[in-house]
């Protein structure tokens, strides 16, 4: 599954709206659950969304670090590395974010992504 670009993500949502169906979204907590979600989407011949919670993001960084930003980046890197092995499009999301994690998790991720966009990545 190719990781969705802004354009392919919008197209995925437009197709779902026109077809009157929902895009499946699965919370993932590890490389195993991410791989299982990708396989499930492929088996169902469906695009999909994978989401990482604040706890899942912390787990991805390693149990001795619990760094949500590093874990989120690791999740995304792994998804990009294996995503092309599967057909379809997959969107990457963070799951619900408690307000107490906005400044230490979501805002840094947004800053990192803004810098990547500036560099054309």
Task: State where each predicted segment sits.
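Catalytic domains of carbohydrate-active enzymes, especially glycoside hydrolases
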Residues: 32-52
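Structural preference for beta-strand elements that scaffold enzyme active sites
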Residues: 21-25, 47-51, 85, 89-93
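N-terminal amphipathic alpha-helix/helix-capping segment at the start of soluble metabolic enzymes
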Residues: 1-24
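Conserved active-site and cofactor/substrate-binding residues in soluble primary-metabolism enzymes
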Residues: 4-8, 28-32, 70-74
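Conserved, mostly hydrophobic/aromatic
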Residues: 27, 37, 95
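Generic secondary-structure signature for well-ordered alpha-helical cores
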Residues: 14-18, 39-46, 80-84
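Gly-rich Lys/Arg/Thr-decorated short loops/hinges at beta-loop-alpha junctions or inter-strand turns
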Residues: 16-20, 51, 58-59
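Active-site beta->alpha loop and helix N-cap motifs at the rims of alpha/beta catalytic domains
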Residues: 54-121
């Amino acid at each position: 599954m190719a990781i969705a670009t802004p354009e392919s993500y919008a197209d995925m949502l437009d197709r779902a709206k026109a077809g009157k169906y929902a895009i499946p979204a699965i919370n993932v907590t590890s490389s195993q659950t991410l791989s299982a979600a990708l396989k499930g989407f492929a088996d169902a011949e469906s695009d999909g969304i994978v989401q990482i919670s604040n706890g899942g993001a912390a787990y991805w960084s390693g149990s001795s670090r619990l760094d949500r930003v590093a874990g989120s980046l690791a999740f995304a890197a792994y998804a990009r590395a294996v995503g092309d092995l599967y057909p379809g499009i997959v969107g990457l999301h963070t799951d619900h974010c408690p307000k107490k994690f906005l400044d230490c998790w979501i805002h840094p991720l947004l800053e990192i992504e803004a810098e990547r966009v500036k560099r054309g990545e």
